[in-house]
Every structure is written in C-alpha cells, then in structure tokens.
C-alpha cells in the first residue's frame, strides 16, 4: 500500500493534526483507542495508508508529533483521541521557540531534529511502499514555521524521491498572533518554495469569515476553525484512503496541479459547509456543491480568485455521485467562467470520485485550486515584512540566534520573485506567447 507518514509541529500543527486524526478515525470506524468497530469492508481496505495495525485489532496512526515545549502535547494526550497515538512518537523539547523562527530552525529545533528523524525513519521503515509525507504547521510561529521547515528539508535530503505535502496555516491580515509573523512567514515561504511539492494554504481569517458568514457562529473558537481544516484535509486525502473510480494520490495530484515547480501553493475549499454540531440533513446536489465549491466565500485562504486566474484545479467528490453529472458540471464551470482559467492549459480541472461520504453527509466536495491570485497573500506578507525590515525592527532576536541579515534579504527577494512569477503566468495568453517563444522555450520546458 502507498503509505503516508504524517508530521505535526508546533502548537497550531498539533491542534490541526489532532482534529484531522479525529476526523479520519471516525471515517475508518476506529474509536478513540484505535480499536476497529466499523461496518464496511471499504473502511479497512486502505487503512494502512495512515494507520499501522498493532495487535488486537488496534490501529495506530503513522503520526509523529513534534513541539519545542510540552504544553500542546500534554493537551493532545489528554484530549479525546490522546490514546490513539504511539507514545514513542511524541518528540518534544522543554524550552519553547518563543515565536522565533531562528530558534526553531537553527538553535532549539536543530537540537531536537535528530530525535524526530529517528522516529520518522522508524515509521518509514514500517511501510511497504512509502508514498510521501504530510506536515501540518503554521508559518507565523517559531516551532511550526522554523522547525517545521527544518524537518522538511532534512526529510527531503533523506527521502529525495518521496512526495512532500504541507498544510500550512499562513498569517492572516486581520487576525495576528505575534508581531514578528511577517518575518517568520517570509523565511518559511523561502524554504517551502524550494522543498515542498504541494502546499495547501489555509488562513485563519478566511476560516473566521466562513464560521461567521456561512456557519453563523457568533464567536468561533479554534476548535471550530480546526474542524473546517480537518474537513478539507480529510477531503484532500479521501482518494488515498478509500478505493474509488477515479483515484488520485499525492503524486498524481502534484502532476496535475503544478505546471511549474515553484508554483505549488494551493487554495482549498470545501462544500457543503456545516458547523460542528449541526449537520444539515437537506439534500445537496452536484450543481449546488459545484457552485458552493467555486464560491470565493468558501475558500480557506484570504485571496479572491476573481483577481487572478486558475492555472489548474482539482475537485474531489464524495458520496453517491454520478460520474457524468460531475463531468458536465465541471465543463459547465469552465465554459461559463473561462476568463478565470488560463487558456494555455486546456481542460485544467481534474476530478476524482469516491463513494464514501464524510460522516453525517450524503455527499461532499473538496476543491483544490492553483490560482495566480494566491500572490495577494504573499504580497501582503511581503509588504509587512518590508515595513519592519527596513527599520531592522526585531532583528536582534534572530541575529542573536546566529542568523545573518543576508538570509532575510534572500527570503524577501525569493518571495517577491514568486509573486512576479504568478503575475507573469496570469498575464500570459496563447497568442502573445508566440513572439516570446524563442528566448523562453529552452528555459521553461527543455524538450526531451
């Protein structure tokens, strides 16, 4: 089977990770101790993608939990699914990274990273055919951002041919946890551009908006936000966990979604959106799901795709869905909104179907889009970065851990390059490209 090893780093990563494991344990018929008491063969068939079978019908997540302070781990352990995880797979320090990327990446995190890699190695050795890794973390803090990206590059070194997917919580414009978020995020993006194969961007503000506007929750808790994220993560990984007519795995997803290696930052969405307690029991149809799924209000990253164009997107439908209906709807979306899709990638929507819906729903859909409008997000962080960096504000916290200002300058320019690459492909048309071909062809696509 094609196994995936899951890592969660830092407070945010561990909380999202815990929600994810809770969601998929439920879908696979596991109780909070990992004992199987489900009803369907399909739940068992691909259990091994995310779970190891231990003795006595018990399944253990292939998860590595990492943090630089014990607090969040204790919370996970004391939570409803705390007994699910293998105790040796909790790796934590005592000092904390204090929202400082340099501590996570160079000092505190670097001391712990070998212990984490030992656990990762052990998990990888327990796999038949490892497909890749997924990591949940935030980009604004110290541990998730600094140590998370350190782990990604170390794992990259050791498993160069395996996929690396990240679920990254990006700082949001209105909801800020720390002043130095722009620094941490820029330094992290600098790493992700080089070392990740696919990054699913999630941001708290967009999640807040969904909770307030769509779910009508007056003051959403992080629990509600994490529930939304886990719904998306469950959707993105459906095809890996259940047999379906049109399956995709991490690599297929990347092949279909990433037209140029650096442009692998995706927006995600989910439909139908329901709050944690109230699963609406009204029937949803494929057209409704499609319409909801492509609605900017449903996107979990604060950038509006109407300001850019889709390079590619992927839609994953779950439940009793007619294949033909999905195809028709997708064609429909593309024809009606052709201005939002680049015309130089024909048929740029990939669809996948899975017969098993999430718990409490008849059908659902998950949306993954590679849109040039994601540059808004990087632009926003970049502007905040520049404002502080110009005055060298807060820099001493980073240089004190042995970082060089040069590294900040590099990260800044790498992110600015990323923004202009997105812009370049947004503006590119089929007709204008003819003249540019002479200089560009060898650089972009060296033909075999």
Swiss-Prot record:
Recorded GO CC terms: cytoplasm; microtubule
What organism does this protein naturally occur in? Answer: Metarhizium anisopliae (Entomophthora anisopliae)
Which annotated residues bind Mg(2+)?
69
Cofactor(s) recorded for this entry are:
Mg(2+)
Keyword Metal-binding found: yes
Which key words are in the record?
Answer: Cytoplasm, Cytoskeleton, GTP-binding, Magnesium, Metal-binding, Microtubule, Nucleotide-binding
* Compartments where located: Cytoplasm, Cytoskeleton
What biological processes does GO assign it?
Answer: microtubule-based process
Q: According to its UniProt record, where is this protein mainly located?
A: cytoplasm
Disordered: annotated segments: 425-448
What the protein does comes down to: Tubulin is the major constituent of microtubules, a cylinder consisting of laterally associated linear protofilaments composed of alpha- and beta-tubulin heterodimers. Microtubules grow by the addition of GTP-tubulin dimers to the microtubule end, where a stabilizing cap forms. Below the cap, tubulin dimers are in GDP-bound state, owing to GTPase activity of alpha-tubulin.
> What is the name of the protein in this document?
Tubulin beta chain
Residue numbers binding GTP: 11, 69, 138, 142-144, 204, 226
């Amino acid at each position: 089977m094609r196994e995936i090893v899951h890592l969660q780093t830092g407070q945010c990563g561990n909380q999202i990770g815990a929600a994810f494991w809770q969601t998929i344990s439920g879908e696979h018929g596991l109780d909070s101790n990992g004992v199987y008491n489900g009803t369907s063969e399909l739940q068992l068939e691909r259990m091994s993608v995310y779970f190891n079978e231990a003795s006595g019908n018990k399944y253990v997540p292939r998860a590595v939990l990492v943090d630089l302070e014990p607090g969040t781990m204790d919370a996970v352990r004391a939570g409803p699914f705390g007994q699910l995880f293998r105790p040796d797979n909790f790796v934590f320090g005592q000092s904390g990274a204090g929202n400082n990327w340099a501590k996570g990446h160079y000092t505190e995190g670097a001391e712990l990273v070998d212990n984490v890699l030992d656990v990762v190695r052990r998990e990888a050795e327990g796999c038949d055919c490892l497909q890749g890794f997924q990591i949940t973390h935030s980009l604004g803090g110290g541990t998730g951002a600094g140590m998370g990206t350190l782990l990604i590059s170390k794992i990259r070194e050791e498993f160069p041919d395996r996929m690396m997917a990240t679920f990254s919580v990006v700082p949001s414009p209105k909801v800020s946890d720390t002043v130095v978020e722009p620094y941490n995020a820029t330094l992290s993006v600098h790493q992700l551009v080089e070392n990740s194969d696919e990054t699913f961007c999630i941001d708290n503000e967009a999640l807040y908006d969904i909770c307030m506007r769509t779910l009508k929750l007056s003051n959403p808790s992080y629990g509600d936000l994490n529930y939304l994220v886990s719904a998306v993560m469950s959707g993105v990984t459906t095809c890996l966990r259940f047999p379906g007519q049109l399956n995709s795995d991490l690599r297929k997803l990347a092949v279909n979604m990433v037209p140029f290696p650096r442009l692998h930052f995706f927006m995600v969405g989910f439909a139908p959106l329901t709050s944690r307690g109230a699963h609406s029991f009204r029937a949803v149809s494929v057209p409704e799901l499609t319409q909801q799924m492509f609605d900017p209000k449903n996107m979990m990253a604060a950038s509006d795709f109407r300001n850019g164009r889709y390079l590619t997107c992927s839609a994953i439908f779950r439940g009793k869905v007619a294949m033909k209906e999905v195809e028709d709807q997708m064609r429909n979306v593309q024809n009606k909104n052709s201005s939002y899709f680049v015309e130089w990638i024909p048929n740029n929507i990939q669809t996948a179907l899975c017969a098993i819906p999430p718990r409490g729903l008849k059908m659902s859909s998950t949306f993954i889009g590679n849109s040039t409008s994601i540059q808004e997000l990087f632009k926003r962080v970049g502007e905040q970065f520049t404002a502080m960096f110009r005055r060298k504000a807060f820099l001493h916290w980073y240089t004190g851990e042995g970082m060089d200002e040069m590294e900040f300058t590099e990260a800044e320019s790498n992110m600015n390059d990323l923004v202009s690459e997105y812009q370049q492909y947004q503006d590119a048309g089929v007709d204008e490209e003819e003249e540019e071909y002479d200089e560009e062809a060898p650089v972009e696509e060296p033909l075999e």
